Amino acid sequence: WIMGHMVNAIYQTDEFVNLGANSIETDVSFDDNANPEYTYHGIPCDCGRSCLKWENYNDFLKGLRSATTPGNSKYQSKLILVVFDLKTGSLYDNQASEAGKKLAKNLLKHYWNNGNNGGRAYIVLSIPDLNHYPLIKGFTDTLKQEGHPELLEKVGYDFSGNDAVGDVAKAYKKAGVSGHVWQSDGITNCLLRGLTRVKEAVANRDSGNGYINKVYYWTVDKRATTRDALDAGVDGVMTNYPDVIADVMNEAAYKNKVRLATYEDSPWVTFKK
């Protein structure tokens, strides 16, 4: 999965997919009442990027639905996965469940079209704080209550705080999650970060009894870092430059080892070599 980083304006979706991304990451900010409000990152953000692009969250979802609904004039068949980077740092811990409920209702209405031929992309809810694990239950319970438990087949989870792998496992246990787990590791492109924890996450994924299904590394903009990440065995790379990642994947060392994921590749099934 080549994951376009910080895609917060609707027009950027096409831009990133046309450069080679089959997945995008979008920031979601919340208002004081835990309503998802804007797709907005703000300052500071990655070096070399504008931090201030934004849409109303519901408008973004409608645009995303168009881009991921076959038959729509704006349909992009390559776009198969969307990571919502949930900026829950602005919320009190006791609002996490409420944020999950509201997120579920927004997605159900504006993205899934109330279960009636909505967008087809897989969704990853990425949460920065392990204490906000109740967001997951708020989300899953709401989809069930609204009569659409089948849509949970399209939803996965990520804790993005670079916490110890064992602590992340405990948070999932509390949230009642087994499966559909992506594990992120990374840092802004302005700084360097080694691959120690990525390798630990990959080992958990491949152990046969770990909690992780897929591992992604962010933010990767350089060819050398891309090679290191691919060598470490990641499933996804989040980047500001999808074309760079696509180029590296076409190099002799990689072109027979890795390929771009398609819609038929389940993002929840651990790849067995």
Curated annotation (Swiss-Prot):
It catalyses: an N-(acyl)-sphingosylphosphocholine = an N-(acyl)-sphingosyl-1,3-cyclic phosphate + choline; an N-(acyl)-sphingosylphosphoethanolamine = an N-(acyl)-sphingosyl-1,3-cyclic phosphate + ethanolamine; a 1-acyl-sn-glycero-3-phosphocholine = a 1-acyl-sn-glycero-2,3-cyclic phosphate + choline; a 1-acyl-sn-glycero-3-phosphoethanolamine = a 1-acyl-sn-glycero-2,3-cyclic phosphate + ethanolamine. GO terms for biological process: killing of cells of another organism; lipid catabolic process. It holds the Pfam family GDPD_2. Its EC number is 4.6.1.-. Keywords: Cytolysis, Dermonecrotic toxin, Disulfide bond, Hemolysis, Lipid degradation, Lipid metabolism, Lyase, Magnesium, Metal-binding, Secreted, Toxin. GO terms for cellular component: extracellular region. Its cofactor is Mg(2+). Expressed by the venom gland. Mg(2+) binds at E25, D27, D85. The keyword Lyase applies. One of its GO terms (molecular function) is lyase activity. InterPro entries: PLC-like_Pdiesterase_TIM-brl. CDD domains: GDPD_like_SMaseD_PLD. It is found in: Secreted. Binds 1 Mg(2+) ion per subunit. Disulfide bonds join C45-C51, C47-C190. Dermonecrotic toxins cleave the phosphodiester linkage between the phosphate and headgroup of certain phospholipids (sphingolipid and lysolipid substrates), forming an alcohol (often choline) and a cyclic phosphate. This toxin acts on sphingomyelin (SM). It may also act on ceramide phosphoethanolamine (CPE), lysophosphatidylcholine (LPC) and lysophosphatidylethanolamine (LPE), but not on lysophosphatidylserine (LPS), and lysophosphatidylglycerol (LPG). It acts by transphosphatidylation, releasing exclusively cyclic phosphate products as second products. Belongs to the arthropod phospholipase D family. Class II subfamily. This is Dermonecrotic toxin LhSicTox-alphaIA2avii.
